[in-house]
């Protein structure tokens, strides 16, 4: 999900709240600090993926929700853009995987 930069299309993308649009039309709307995504924000990809949650130094970090194009969702904790900590992955077919995640893998189901 790597996108090449285009630029700040609205607001303050250095220190504040702004919108950044990438060449592939991926869009980030949210808080910025020192030119990096930091705080609460939303990334929307043209292919239907949406991440809404917390960022630290432009990485998904803290509480957040990733929604997949097929309707599946992961709701929970993130660290360095990976599922890390307590979280729930709900697949489009109704299957639910819940528990402790480490680097994107479910390590302690509950």
Where are these regions (language model features)?
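Glycine/tyrosine- and acidic-biased, solvent-exposed loop/turn segments at the edges of beta-strands
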Residues: 1-110
């Amino acid at each position: 999900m790597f996108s090449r930069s285009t630029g700040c299309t609205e607001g303050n993308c250095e220190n504040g709240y702004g919108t950044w649009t990438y060449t592939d039309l991926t869009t980030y709307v949210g808080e910025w600090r020192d030119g990096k995504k930091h705080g609460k924000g939303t990334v929307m990809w043209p292919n239907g993926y949406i991440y809404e949650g917390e960022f630290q130094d432009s990485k998904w970090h803290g509480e957040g929700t990733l929604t997949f194009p097929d309707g599946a969702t992961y709701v929970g904790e993130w660290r360095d853009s990976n599922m890390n900590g307590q979280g729930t992955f709900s697949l489009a077919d109704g299957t639910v995987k819940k528990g402790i995640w480490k680097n994107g893998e479910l390590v302690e189901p509950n």
